[in-house]
């Protein structure tokens, strides 16, 4: 049952983020949208942060208020719920090294790091 609850939470969070970003894109404050859909701004915040689950009826009101079809809130949901790959410790380290390398501004320093890695890679264990 825990996995199902995780999926439900991810869906609630996905929809909440869509509400939040669309509200901001439309230039509406939380208070303004809350008044249109007849809830408090605190309740709207709970929907946006997936603290409270939103009913379909309320989601329809939000879609109308934000001039969107209700389908908008579900677009991309399937992709968002795909399990993320689990990285091994080695893969995480490679990602970290790559990210840190990209932060080096100097071409000379990047070349020095590259030469060091080549040297270490050529060593026999």
Curated annotation (Swiss-Prot):
Domain HTH cro/C1-type: 19-73
Matches recorded under SUPFAM superfamilies: lambda repressor-like DNA-binding domains
DNA-binding region extent: 30-49
Annotated Gene3D superfamilies: lambda repressor-like DNA-binding domains
Gene Ontology MF terms in the entry: DNA binding
A Pfam family of this chain: HTH_3
Keywords: DNA-binding, Transcription, Transcription regulation
Protein name as annotated: Uncharacterized HTH-type transcriptional regulator RC0668
Organism: Rickettsia conorii (strain ATCC VR-613 / Malish 7)
């Amino acid at each position: 049952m825990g996995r199902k609850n995780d999926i439900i939470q991810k869906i609630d969070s996905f929809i909440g983020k869509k509400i939040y970003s669309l509200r901001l894109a439309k230039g509406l404050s939380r208070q303004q949208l809350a008044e249109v859909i007849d809830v408090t701004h605190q309740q709207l915040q709970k929907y946006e942060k997936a603290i409270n689950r939103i009913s379909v009826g309320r989601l329809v009101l939000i879609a109308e208020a934000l001039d969107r079809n209700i389908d908008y809130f579900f677009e991309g949901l399937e992709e968002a719920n795909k399990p993320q790959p689990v990285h091994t410790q080695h893969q995480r380290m490679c990602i970290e090294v790559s990210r840190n390398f990209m932060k080096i501004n100097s071409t000379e320093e990047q070349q020095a790091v590259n030469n060091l890695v080549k040297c270490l890679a050529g060593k026999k264990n």
